[in-house]
A protein has these predicted regions:
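Hydrophobic alpha-helical transmembrane segments of membrane transport and translocation systems
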Residues: 119-148
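Charged, alpha-helix-enriched surfaces in structured cytosolic catalytic cores
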Residues: 19, 113, 134
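Juxtamembrane loop-helix boundary motifs flanking transmembrane segments in multi-pass membrane proteins
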Residues: 8, 12, 16, 63-67, ...
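Residue-level signal for secondary-structure boundary elements
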Residues: 2-5, 32, 36, 130, ...
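C-terminal end of P-loop GTPase domains and the immediately downstream helical coupling element
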Residues: 1-25
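Membrane-inserting effector segments that mediate pore formation, membrane fusion
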Residues: 24-61, 65-120
Length: 148
């Protein structure tokens, strides 16, 4: 926690990037494990909460004031098409769970990879100061890469 506050207040980009990267890896792993559970759509509220928390912590690490509004605006700014693609991906993830064992494994991978894509976009925008349009392209590109 001391490292986080130091990086936040000094706006030390390398420290912020390191901490955000650690958050990204941790949340992606946790979401991947949550996505392994075999009941379709039961993990969706947990995943959404974890992903929102991850984005909020990345915003906090960047030194900006955190609030549900800012996180919501960022998620909305990624684009309606990205949200629709994410929703379709979640639907496919739920459907594939009906395949014993492998369905849950693929679902866990997609949950972790989707969280990773969202976190990379948040880091690009809030830590690296990447323009919003470029951040959208990065997010969409990462989502296209993960085909279950």
């Amino acid at each position: 926690e001391a490292q986080l506050e130091f990086a936040r207040f000094t706006a030390a980009r390398r420290a912020q990037a390191f901490i955000a990267s650690q958050l990204l890896k941790s949340f992606s792993a946790v979401c991947g494990v949550v996505g392994l559970q075999p009941i379709p759509l039961a993990d969706l509220p947990v995943l959404l909460a974890l992903q929102s928390l991850m984005v909020g912590l990345i915003v906090h690490t960047s030194g900006r004031p955190v609030g549900p509004r800012l996180v919501g605006e960022f998620l909305a700014a990624l684009g309606i098409n990205a949200a629709a693609g994410f929703a379709l991906r979640e639907g496919a993830r739920a459907a594939i769970r009906f395949v014993p064992f492998w369905g849950s494994a693929v679902s866990g991978f997609v949950a972790g990879a989707g969280t990773y894509a969202l976190g990379r976009a948040a880091i690009a925008y809030f830590i690296d100061d990447t323009p919003l349009e470029e951040t959208r392209r990065l997010f969409r590109k990462m989502l296209r890469r993960q085909n279950p």
